[in-house]
């Protein structure tokens, strides 16, 4: 666990491009409506940084919260349909507020709504990358949110923390700032005087034994401290320095002041956005078990998973779903997007692709999981294949 301010924290003030994520609890009143004063304070900070020459992207939650009051909801809805209804009402209200506040600084706000699928598919990924990059070039401030109205339970971020980390990767940002309602990561309950602020995290090993618990206090947002730390991990694996602190510390964090918790970025090759999503932002819909030869091929040789190496299937999933790849003892070794329904795989197990093509047709000679749709999990980190 780090005890001091890292050398790279001071470089935040010179960052060329920053992504700032703010959660619902930092934008709303105790009653759940939009807090215009908080939004104004945040836009003042971001406008100040933008005018200093830094490209700024804001990932903002709050659409569901903003839509609650107009729909007569007193508590955040738990079912997806009502969440989507609230988001469809609230997203326009949220953007209108940001547009008005940034206009005070002669800046233009631009709405970007993304789904996990947009960052999983190469063409959509590139389109999102080009659109946001162009907005930054012409001086606008992209405001990103998950497209809650069309996202599904199966393929969604569920909170904007992980979305922010993947956007930081997509845009090759220098810094990610995660703003929440606590001032830092602590080694215990932050409300207890015995808890100590963690000033710097150099790697996952620094958090072994730390009880992350939940930072949610008001029931407005969806992300707790666990998802924020996971998002910091995604970003730092992509080489993006990350600061976790409260919205009240936004200005200080962007100056590189020693506030909050600083997560030191990794220095290895950047993984692809798809690999980061598979490793960190989704759960397997089922499991495919591999024999030792297949484990070696997938993990060491970075090969695709072929039917011949499969020994068992568990769960109910469809082609295109993420699945966990496990060795014969059940140890998770990789995760990938499967090419077959779970009901189809038992008839393919142990067979060569040549036999399958001859007996069942060419459509059954495909890999179970193609190497381009697969991420090897080693001690919780992604493999070092080329970034997309």
Swiss-Prot record:
EC number(s) per entry: 2.7.2.11
Pfam families noted in UniProt: AA_kinase, PUA
Subcellular location: Cytoplasm
Pathway: Amino-acid biosynthesis; L-proline biosynthesis; L-glutamate 5-semialdehyde from L-glutamate: step 1/2
One term under GO cellular component: cytosol
Catalytic activity: L-glutamate + ATP = L-glutamyl 5-phosphate + ADP
Leader sequence segment: none
Molecular function terms from GO: ATP binding; glutamate 5-kinase activity; RNA binding
Biological process terms in GO annotation: L-proline biosynthetic process
Alphabetized NCBIfam families for the sequence: proB
Identification of the protein by name: Glutamate 5-kinase
């Amino acid at each position: 666990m780090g005890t001091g301010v890292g050398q790279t924290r001071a470089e935040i003030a010179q960052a060329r491009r920053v992504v700032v994520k703010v959660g619902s609890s930092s934008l709303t009143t105790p009653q759940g409506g939009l807090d215009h004063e908080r939004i104004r304070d945040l836009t003042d900070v971001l406008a100040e940084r933008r005018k200093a020459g830094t490209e700024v992207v804001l990932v903002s939650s709050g659409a569901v919260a903003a839509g609650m009051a107009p729909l007569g909801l007193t508590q955040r809805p738990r079912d997806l349909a009502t969440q989507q209804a609230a988001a469809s009402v609230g997203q326009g209200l949220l953007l209108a507020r940001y547009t008005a506040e940034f206009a005070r600084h002669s800046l233009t706000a631009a709405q970007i709504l993304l789904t996990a699928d947009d960052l999983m598919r190469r063409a959509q990924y590139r389109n999102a990358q080009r659109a946001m990059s162009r907005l930054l070039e012409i001086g606008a401030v992209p405001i990103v949110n998950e497209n809650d109205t069309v996202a599904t339970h199966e393929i969604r971020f569920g909170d904007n923390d992980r979305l922010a980390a993947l956007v930081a990767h997509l845009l090759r940002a220098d810094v990610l700032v995660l703003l929440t309602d606590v001032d830092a990561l602590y080694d215990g309950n932050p409300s207890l005087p015995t808890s100590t602020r963690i000033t710097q995290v150099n790697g996952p090993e620094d958090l072994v034994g730390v009880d992350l618990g939940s930072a949610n206090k008001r029931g407005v947002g969806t992300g707790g401290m666990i998802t924020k730390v996971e998002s910091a991990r995604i970003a730092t694996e992509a080489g993006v320095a990350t600061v976790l602190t409260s919205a009240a510390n936004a200005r200080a964090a962007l100056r590189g002041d020693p506030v909050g918790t600083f997560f030191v970025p990794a220095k290895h090759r950047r993984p692809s956005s798809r690999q980061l999503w598979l490793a960190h932002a989704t759960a397997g819909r089922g499991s495919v078990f591999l024999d030792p030869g297949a484990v070696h091929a997938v993990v060491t040789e970075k090969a695709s998973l072929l039917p011949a190496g499969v020994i068992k299937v568990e769960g109910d999933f469809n082609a295109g779903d993420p699945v966990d790849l496990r060795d014969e003892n059940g140890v998770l070794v990789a995760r990938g997007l499967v090419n077959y329904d779970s009901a189809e795989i038992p008839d393919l197990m142990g067979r060569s692709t040549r036999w399958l093509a001859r007996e069942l047709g060419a459509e059954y000679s495909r890999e179970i999981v193609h190497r381009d749709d697969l991420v090897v999990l080693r001690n919780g980190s992604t493999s070092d294949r080329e970034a997309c």
